[in-house]
Amino acid sequence: MYITIIGILLAVVAVLIFFDKEDKHVELLIYTAVVLLMFFIVAFRPIGIDKDSIMYTEMYSDPDFMVEPTFKWISSISSLVLGDVRGVFIMYALLAIPLKAWSIHKLSEYSLLAVLIWMGHFFIIHECTQIRAAVAVAIFLYAIRYLSEGKKKKYLLAIMVAMIFHYSSLLYLPLVFLGNSSLSTRWKYFLYLAPLIGYLLAILRIDLLELVPIPFFQDKIKVYQEMKDKGVMAGDDINIFNVAFLLKLLIYYFLLIKYEVIKDKARYMPIMLKIYAFSTLVFLLFSFMPVLAYRGSEMLAVVEIVLIPYLVYAVRPINVARLLVVLFVFAVFLQDVFYNNLLLQSVS
């Protein structure tokens, strides 16, 4: 039933994007209504319908559990106000969804296409499952405008806030050196070569992370490796040639090829392409450790929400571009719920 509700909402939004008549007021009303529904779907979901909510219930009941301070604060407020773990899910949804929705609306000219991509994948893996990461990612999306405007101090401050919600937000710090200026020839070469270099290093099994002198990274890798060795988490390396990843790379390269054609219309395209390139590198370089590869890359790949709608500037007629986005979204959604089993139909 839970999957059906999300699927129906996805289908409704998918139909509505074909009736877009450039009326921004109507689009904003629809966008707001969809976001509100997404909030209620997440905040009041059955515990156990996703892969992490039972774990969060256990964390809520164990004050000694090692976790970010914000989770402890939110748990305390939930216990005081509602006396139940439900308050944790409501408050995380209140923190993540409005901020992410506002940020997407500011970054994207096509809000309905963007929310479709959000709901079809990132909504499931973040808001429905990894609720701490959901808030961190929302803050990151908000901070991208600071990055694009060269306001590096504000960007760093935002990421420091994100880190108290999820320590993996440390991954966002190196991006402070990025900007949104038009792509230079050197940047174009890098963007074309980055995934290929990632593939080469992954195939040769060269682990660059061993060279990173940051205790956080080293400790995290050690913990994941120990869990992998004990069989606590998946031990097999990722198939770096899986269809979903190759499809995303195809879209990435297509937009990169079309960069000169659409750059004047796609305001944030340079920085989105740069961030997306780094997400592919994280996926490939961490491929020997599935949890790190997927979770790390997805925290960066969230820019797909803004990047993929740029297809409407590159493909004509525009309804063909919309159809391509819809097909992509439903393919990823079906994979998430029926192949990866990120959500259950019901809770026993």
Q: What is each residue range found by the language model?
A:
Residues 91-107:
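Transmembrane-helix motifs of polytopic, lipid-linked glycan transferases
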Residues 104-120:
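Transmembrane-helix signature of polytopic, membrane-embedded enzymes
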